[in-house]
UniProtKB/Swiss-Prot annotation:
Function in brief: Regulatory subunit of the cyclin-dependent kinase pair (CDK9/cyclin-T1) complex, also called positive transcription elongation factor B (P-TEFb), which facilitates the transition from abortive to productive elongation by phosphorylating the CTD (C-terminal domain) of the large subunit of RNA polymerase II (RNA Pol II). Required to activate the protein kinase activity of CDK9: acts by mediating formation of liquid-liquid phase separation (LLPS) that enhances binding of P-TEFb to the CTD of RNA Pol II.
Name of this protein: Cyclin-T1
Post-translational modification: ADP-ribosylation on serine residues by PARP1 in response to DNA damage disrupts the phase separation activity of CCNT1, thereby preventing activation of CDK9.
Source organism of the structure: Mus musculus (Mouse)
Residue(s) carrying N6-acetyllysine: 390
Gene Ontology molecular function terms on file: 7SK snRNA binding; chromatin binding; cyclin-dependent protein serine/threonine kinase activator activity; DNA binding; DNA-binding transcription factor binding; molecular condensate scaffold activity; protein kinase binding; RNA polymerase binding
Entries under InterPro entries matching the protein: Cyclin-like_dom, Cyclin-like_sf, Cyclin/Ssn8, CYCLIN_CCNT1_rpt2, Cyclin_N
Domains: entry comment: The histidine-rich domain (HRD) region is intrinsically disordered and promotes the formation of phase-separated liquid droplets that enhance binding of the P-TEFb complex to the CTD (C-terminal domain) of the large subunit of RNA polymerase II (RNA Pol II).
Biased composition (Low complexity): 559-569
SUPFAM superfamilies per record: Cyclin-like (SSF47954)
Modified residues (Phosphoserine): 117, 388, 494, 498
Transport as UniProt keyword: no
Family per similarity comment: Belongs to the cyclin family. Cyclin C subfamily.
Amino acid sequence: MEGERKNNNKRWYFTREQLENSPSRRFGVDSDKELSYRQQAANLLQDMGQRLNVSQLTINTAIVYMHRFYMIQSFTQFHRYSMAPAALFLAAKVEEQPKKLEHVIKVAHTCLHPQESLPDTRSEAYLQQVQDLVILESIILQTLGFELTIDHPHTHVVKCTQLVRASKDLAQTSYFMATNSLHLTTFSLQYTPPVVACVCIHLACKWSNWEIPVSTDGKHWWEYVDATVTLELLDELTHEFLQILEKTPSRLKRIRNWRAYQAAMKTKPDDRGADENTSEQTILNMISQTSSDTTIAGLMSMSTASTSAVPSLPSSEESSSSLTSVDMLQGERWLSSQPPFKLEAAQGHRTSESLALIGVDHSLQQDGSSAFGSQKQASKSVPSAKVSLKEYRAKHAEELAAQKRQLENMEANVKSQYAYAAQNLLSHDSHSSVILKMPIESSENPERPFLDKADKSALKMRLPVASGDKAVSSKPEEIKMRIKVHSAGDKHNSIEDSVTKSREHKEKQRTHPSNHHHHHNHHSHRHSHLQLPAGPVSKRPSDPKHSSQTSTLAHKTYSLSSTLSSSSSTRKRGPPEETGAAVFDHPAKIAKSTKSSLNFPFPPLPTMTQLPGHSSDTSGLPFSQPSCKTRVPHMKLDKGPPGANGHNATQSIDYQDTVNMLHSLLSAQGVQPTQAPAFEFVHSYGEYMNPRAGAISSRSGTTDKPRPPPLPSEPPPPLPPLPK
């Protein structure tokens, strides 16, 4: 397999004789004309790529496709301006930046015919262009043998300049020359990418009067890149590169207005040979073309800000290996200004423009960096053109602030709606039956996505008031809870018993103040046949299991307490034993135990941001099972056989449960009730004591006797377990 791959790689590298005998040459196109056609096609690919907003990597890949294609096909058979859009269309897909066929055709038309209007997409000419481009793409694929993975010299330039800790200017110049070699020469058809990278670095060093020192191992820097490279080969290819640059018309030199090179125009004159003077002047002329900035911006794809003036060329060619002036810099100083490339370790396949520089051949870097590091001389500080994350965030601060304000407004609206609805419910007339609809968490709920955007912990809660009649049936995914208001007849059965128990619980609470906080988390809010979607703090995979209606009472209460208390676990409420006493006790006991105090004090509840340390898993909290078991005899005296949910099938949830549930919901939404008595019940208490006959008759359909609702003075005592 490896040998096959090597043979395939060698297939696309040609000797000078093969280049002189190319298909275009056989059809009568001379060498200079063929090179000019290649440069024009590369020029069009660069222009189109910038307009299509694809990466420089994609443009470079398309240029290599073009060079290889015309080693098999002739320019006389396939026009360069027809083939270039197809090559770019294919390269964009290979490099994972696909563009629409329509966009590619329109951009090609704009580049080739800037004065003409865009073709109508329904016209015959446009449809013919579409068909031609698709056919050409197929021809390119077949001509290339579907070998679409391209290794570029830029990757090796980056690795080598890192290895030798080159300065920012040298790294930028070398990278720039690598792009130049693709646009203007046929080096990509003659030499492997490491060799081309060495030529580009050597040319940059020679022109910039920089020298990369010999390592402590006695090796030259290019030996770490490619062992086959010699100084003679580098000098020969550098001379060839400069000759091509001299012949190339200025209109094809798409390297313009680069400040680093323009600054080189101000270098001091130096004694040198006439041929080298001509060569240097060629580079300077090539670079200092005054034309549009947009072309070089796309070609470079890197920061060119604040590059210092570059020294002149050395006086002789031999001096390129014996100069003493060395300017070294940390390898990281220039990385931020490079157009990043990404390569795989094995085959150099890049799927995006960014190069994971961390993953670049660390073994090579470890071998060479220590050797070159010992030769490092005085460093020259070059200002970095890096754009930091802070600067980027500052640039987009206004946009982020606007989005944040919008989200906060949405969240505040949802919270205010819940608070308003809860206060209406708590202060409502006793003769209205209140229906709470809480949707089970499901993907079919059409109102859920909006709530997720505003506050993902939002519970959907509707509080319509029915006028004594039976409420409209709820949706399949919603659960109804009818809060019944019962008559005063049942509340006198166990007055003394509940008062005594209330006092005992207060005494217990005084003796166990340390257990109050976590004990309340498990026993403050228990709703045995209510299913709540978990909030963001307590969202666990086990919640659907715990909240199923047929589960045991222990699972039900444990799930609900973990769901509700995890978001409000730092608040302090009434005594724990009293917080659960009225939940499953006889209604008469509840009525009496809550009659003694009409005010319901609620301390401020913490918001979600004040609870960073509280886990949604309540398994670590103390669960006072023994104290719950002491309540079992009272349960057996007052209750009938338990139903599927832990109480009688026809028994309704008490009013106290609703109060506790609503305050849990408010705390989960971050709404803080006032320290003063939050709800005043005195004005309507007389109506609870003397319910009207109409309210009783409206509830005659149930088997329970009407009872007045318990008016909460403190949270209910702990919940006893279900009798076996």
